[in-house]
Swiss-Prot record:
NDH-1 shuttles electrons from NADH, via FMN and iron-sulfur (Fe-S) centers, to quinones in the respiratory chain. The immediate electron acceptor for the enzyme in this species is believed to be ubiquinone. Couples the redox reaction to proton translocation (for every two electrons transferred, four hydrogen ions are translocated across the cytoplasmic membrane), and thus conserves the redox energy in a proton gradient. One of its GO terms (biological process) is aerobic respiration. Its EC number is 7.1.1.-. Residues 51-80, 90-119 form the 4Fe-4S ferredoxin-type domain. It comes from Rickettsia prowazekii (strain Madrid E). This is NADH-quinone oxidoreductase subunit I. Belongs to the complex I 23 kDa subunit family. [4Fe-4S] cluster 1 binds at residues 60, 63, 66, 109. Binds 2 [4Fe-4S] clusters per subunit. One of its GO terms (molecular function) is quinone binding. InterPro entries: 4Fe4S_Fe-S-bd (IPR017896), 4Fe4S_Fe_S_CS (IPR017900), NADH_quinone_OxRdtase_chainI (IPR010226). NDH-1 is composed of 14 different subunits. Subunits NuoA, H, J, K, L, M, N constitute the membrane sector of the complex.
């Protein structure tokens, strides 16, 4: 009998409408994405970048630890020896379609050369645009250097 009265007086609909009215006048929790952006965690793993020293020389010493530790095998490195005996990369490619953004390459790097930056807006229509070469990675590093340095400084206690 009680179930009949509840269905006769549309109890479920009234209950649903009161819940809707309860939240109707409260402030919105959604963000108008392209125009508003939510804060990003300092430990966020985004687009990759290769960093340089203050004198402009690239940090990568071609130890290939990042290539060895990458579980997705997304990193390809070729190196050559310089006249002074040090090694530097001649090719540093990352296939971003394979990358799983685990951050192991960043953790393995002894000189903080490869880092995952704050940028997450790098969508593309073609596969070839998501294969990053050394120049693009260095440009990302130059573009985001201040943010990358701050990120590494904040994250230092966890490393």
């Amino acid at each position: 009998m009680i179930n009949y009265l509840k269905s006769f007086f549309l109890y479920e609909i009234i209950r649903g409408m009161t819940l809707t009215l309860k939240y109707f006048f409260k402030p919105k929790v959604t963000i108008n994405y392209p125009y508003e952006k939510s804060p990003v965690s300092p430990r966020f793993k985004g687009e990759h970048a290769l960093r340089r020293y203050e004198n402009g020389e690239e940090r990568c010493i071609a130890c290939k630890l990042c290539e060895a530790i990458c579980p997705a095998q997304a990193i390809v490195i070729e190196s050559d020896e310089r006249d002074d005996g040090s090694r530097r990369t001649t090719r540093y490619d990352i296939d971003m379609t394979k990358c799983i953004y685990c951050g192991l390459c960043q953790e393995a790097c002894p000189v903080d050369a490869i880092v995952e930056g704050p940028n997450f807006e790098f969508a593309s229509l073609t596969h070839t645009a998501l294969i990053y070469d050394k120049e693009r990675l260095l440009n990302n590093g130059d573009k985001w250097e201040q943010a990358l340095a701050n990120k590494l400084h904040k994250d230092y206690q966890y490393r």
